[in-house]
């Protein structure tokens, strides 16, 4: 026995001797410290753990031979706030803290009624070669140990970012045995019912380090949690996400994106774009490049509810669709509901895009800015009232006239100009643990003209005030009131005898109250009420020159009220089965005063020839539409890595976009339902299989859906849509159906991460043959946005901490069009005969974008840190057809193809933080 003991002691001494005698030779000139760490790793058996701000941003120069690495690193860290500590063969570098490697002697003598805190003098304990914050190694006592014991308790609190104090929505909190979980709401608040006794709670969030809290639970209580950003070792790059959500979450057809995870994806002109990311997801399509709207699972562009801090955005883009309306430096997260739409949402039948802004840094002043070829932006944020509140302000503006100046004069668009600006402001204040208020405002203005004689302008504006109140650990609610505005103005003076101006506006005042009640571990109830008051000004058509022959025309304003109540229950039948069932009942009242036409009953549809007389009503309710909307989702876990989900939604929509264009346009007209234009309704059925691989770092999913739509407005042949007091004579309600399969693979971890998806889908429309004389009236015809095949790839490769490469590929079938197929003469006049509607297609779409991102190296003593982004949009230079149109020239019909970006477009932008 002594022999083996002596051998063990000798081996330990040799190991310690070898550990102490490791030497390195280093020659670096003005290089980041990360390169020093790589040299030490290669020449010794040390492992180094640090944050990226040390390894990348600290610039050093060193020329040493046969030097001891620990002494060398300590010299390099002099005059900084970073401390070096070691444990076995690991080196840890942490800001303002050192590490202890043993427990205090009194650790095991504490009683269970105390908080077991092993942190000493701002140090962090290290066990099993891991760096753990003191918050993870202490045991938190929740409740009163002397209270009457209960088998279950309710734990509530707020999860926030340790760096800036901002609350964090969408954070997963999970008890693994037994399996009980929840997620934080939009304010970072959570409520979870847990079995009493000693428990470990795991906390996960996108881009943040996984954390754990050791709890001793006696009775109901509160625990606020702070999460830190993911630490990255030199040898590995990890993209952290809610890895189990793909399998365990209830929702199907839901995409959640944190803005930090998409900033490297290449977009036109180098600006991070929320809508471009949305369009890179499966099941989301657009009519073409720089489209202002998007189509979700066969729905039209007006069937998507776009929310920004609870306010409605009617025009979500700037500058013809080049940029989205959302400032990426202000946005914190977004959720896209393609199905499994919660009962609290309503008003559109296809999807909900809910975008939320940051709250602002609650701990220190911070700013960010960027400079690009077309646009610049600036963001400022800071704490208020000693950290009880915060504010954030951001603005963007463009200087793009130089680009339009490059358009050749022969194009007919000489001397044009275009520009926009938008402003975001938000402030919040937390009075106490139960009450907090949030104020947000948004304004944007676009203007453009292709000649000096034309003018186009449009604007969005939103304001909301929100009060979050916690009645008790089980019951919380949110009250919101606000105002939304959208308007456009056009003026044309090319011909003074026909010079005119045209304007349109829609205003809405809204209010809502949402309640969440945590009944028990199996039931969570959500209920609420909301209402919207609409005032729509359809248009004023006015002469703008003394010689103009235009006759003044002012359409009467329209007023309506939309209200709804809802109730839903999330029921956990067992750890394997979970169901969410909800009902929403909506009511739409058409308000007076109103003038309307009375049509002859001899005609199937309203028409000019069928008008019998005009009638008017005063104030009051002219007509009411109402109906229930059902929501049902279910999930079954097959095993820990596989689940199957299904759901059904029924939706109602009372406002419609009137347009004869495939894409959204600033001059599109919106129309409220009236006596003859009925609300749109839609029903969607969906099911899917979800499975994770490679230790939950690769997510896969297959979703199948079928959707029906009724009363979708399609324009009639020869329709005149502008300034129509009887718009019902120019449009017709049609039926629609859409179905498809979406396949997606996500890689969440490693230097290479991103996703690839394939979608096969169809979107079809149908009119009864009595409604029109078109050739294919009795058949289903493809919708204008029908694209059967679509493949999308988004990838990021992290070369080093400072350098990364991004690639975006997009392929889709060309959208359908109607073309002239013959010409004929009748009574001395030539006519063109068109094909069946949407029988042909434009050429297939294909585009590749690449970008290279450089994180600039700076000394820690500097106040600013920047990064540089360069790339090429449409790297292959393919001339994708935006549209195909035909012009009669010398008695011949000539076809033309319009391409928006027919060549590679290089771009560069510089971003700075301070």
Q: What do these predicted ranges mean?
A:
Residues 706-708, 727-821:
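Gram-negative outer-membrane beta-barrel transporters
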Residues 487-489, 535-547, 551, 589-613, ...:
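Surface-exposed extracellular loop regions of Gram-negative outer-membrane beta-barrel proteins
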Residues 802, 811-829, 845-849, 853-914:
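C-terminal beta-signal and adjacent terminal beta-strands/loops
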């Amino acid at each position: 026995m002594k022999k083996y003991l002596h051998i063990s002691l000798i081996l330990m001494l040799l190991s310690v001797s070898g550990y102490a005698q490791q030497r390195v030779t280093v020659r670096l000139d003005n290089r980041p410290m990360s390169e020093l760490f790589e040299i030490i790793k290669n020449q010794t058996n040390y492992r180094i753990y640090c944050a990226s701000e040390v390894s990348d941003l600290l610039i050093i120069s060193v020329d040493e031979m046969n030097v001891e690495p620990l002494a060398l690193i300590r010299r390099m860290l002099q005059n900084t706030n970073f401390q070096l500590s070691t444990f076995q063969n690991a080196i840890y570098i942490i800001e303002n803290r050192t590490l202890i490697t043993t427990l205090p002697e009194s650790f095991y003598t504490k009683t269970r009624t105390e908080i077991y805190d092993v942190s000493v003098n701002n140090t962090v304990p290290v066990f099993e070669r891991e760096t753990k914050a003191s918050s993870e190694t202490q045991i938190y006592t929740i409740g009163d140990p002397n209270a009457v014991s209960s088998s279950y308790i309710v734990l509530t609190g707020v999860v926030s970012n340790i760096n800036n104090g901002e609350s964090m929505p969408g954070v997963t909190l999970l008890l693994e045995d037994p399996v009980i979980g929840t997620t934080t709401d939009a304010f970072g608040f959570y409520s979870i019912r847990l079995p009493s006794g000693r428990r470990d709670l795991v906390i996960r969030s996108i881009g943040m380090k996984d954390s754990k809290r050791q709890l001793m639970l006696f009775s109901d209580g509160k625990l606020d949690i702070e999460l830190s950003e993911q630490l990255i070792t030199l040898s590995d790059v990890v993209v952290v996400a809610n890895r189990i959500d793909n399998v365990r979450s209830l929702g199907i057809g839901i995409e959640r994106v944190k803005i930090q995870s998409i900033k490297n994806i290449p977009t036109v002109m180098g600006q991070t774009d929320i809508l471009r990311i949305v369009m890179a997801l499966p099941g989301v399509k657009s009519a073409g490049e720089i489209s202002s709207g998007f189509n979700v699972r066969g729905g039209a562009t007006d069937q998507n509810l776009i929310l920004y801090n609870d306010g409605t955005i009617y025009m979500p883009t700037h500058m013809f669709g080049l940029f989205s309306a959302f400032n990426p430096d202000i946005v914190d997260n977004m959720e896209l509901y393609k199905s499994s739409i919660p009962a609290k949402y309503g008003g559109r039948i296809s999807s909900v895009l809910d975008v939320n802004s940051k709250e602002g840094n609650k701990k220190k002043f911070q700013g960010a800015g960027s400079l690009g070829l077309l646009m610049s932006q600036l963001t400022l944020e800071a704490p208020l009232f000693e950290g009880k509140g915060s504010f954030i302000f951001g603005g963007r503006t463009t200087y793009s006239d130089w680009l339009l100046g490059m358009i050749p004069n022969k194009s007919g668009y000489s001397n044009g100009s275009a520009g926009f600006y938008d402003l975001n402001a938000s402030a919040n204040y937390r009075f106490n643990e139960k009450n907090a208020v949030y104020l947000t405002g948004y304004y944007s203005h676009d203007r453009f003209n292709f000649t000096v004689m034309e003018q186009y302008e449009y604007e969005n504006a939103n304001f909301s005030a929100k009060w979050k109140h916690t009645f008790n650990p089980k019951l919380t609610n949110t009250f919101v009131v606000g105002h939304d505005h959208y308007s456009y103005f056009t003026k044309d003076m090319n011909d003074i005898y026909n010079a005119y101006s045209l304007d349109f506006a829609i205003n809405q005042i809204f209010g809502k109250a949402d309640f969440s009640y945590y009944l028990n571990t199996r039931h969570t109830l959500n209920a609420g009420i909301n209402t919207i008051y609409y005032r729509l000004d359809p248009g004023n058509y006015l002469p703008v020159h003394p010689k103009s022959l235009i006759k003044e025309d002012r359409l009467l304003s329209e007023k309506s009220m939309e209200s709804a109540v809802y109730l839903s229950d999330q029921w956990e039948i067992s750890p394997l089965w979970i169901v969410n069932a909800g009902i929403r009942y909506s009511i739409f009242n058409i308000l007076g005063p109103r003038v309307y036409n009375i049509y002859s009953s001899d005609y199937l549809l309203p028409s000019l020839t069928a008008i019998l007389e005009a009638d008017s009503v005063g104030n009051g309710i002219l007509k009411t539409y109402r109906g229930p909307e059902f929501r049902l989702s279910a999930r079954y876990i097959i095993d820990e890595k596989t689940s199957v989900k299904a759901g059904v939604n029924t939706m109602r929509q009372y406002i419609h976009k009137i347009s004869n264009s495939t894409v959204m346009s600033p001059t599109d007209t919106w129309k409220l339902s009236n006596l003859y234009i009925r609300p749109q309704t839609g029903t969607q059925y969906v099911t899917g299989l979800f499975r994770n691989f490679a230790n939950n770092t690769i997510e896969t999913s297959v979703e199948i859906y079928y959707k029906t739509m009724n009363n979708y407005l399609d324009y009639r042949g020869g329709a005149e849509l502008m300034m129509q007091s009887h718009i019902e004579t120019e449009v017709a309600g049609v039926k629609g159906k859409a179905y498809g399969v979406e396949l997606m693979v996500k890689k969440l971890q490693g230097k290479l991460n991103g996703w690839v998806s394939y979608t096969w889908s169809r979107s079809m429309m149908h009119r009864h043959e009595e409604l029109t004389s078109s050739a294919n009236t009795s058949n289903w015809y493809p919708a204008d946005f029908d694209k059967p095949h679509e493949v999308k790839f988004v990838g990021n490769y992290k070369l080093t901490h400072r350098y990364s490469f991004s690639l975006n590929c997009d392929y889709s079938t060309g959208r359908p069009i109607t073309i002239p197929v013959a010409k004929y003469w009748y009574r001395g006049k030539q006519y063109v005969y068109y094909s069946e509607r949407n029988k042909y297609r434009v050429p297939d779409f294909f585009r590749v974008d690449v970008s290279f991102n450089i994180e600039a190296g700076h000394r820690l003593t500097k106040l600013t840190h920047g990064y540089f982004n360069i790339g090429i949009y449409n790297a292959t230079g393919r001339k994708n057809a935006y549209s195909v149109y035909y012009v009669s020239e010398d008695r011949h019909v000539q076809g033309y193809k319009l391409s928006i970006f027919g060549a590679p477009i290089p771009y560069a932008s510089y971003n700075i933080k301070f």
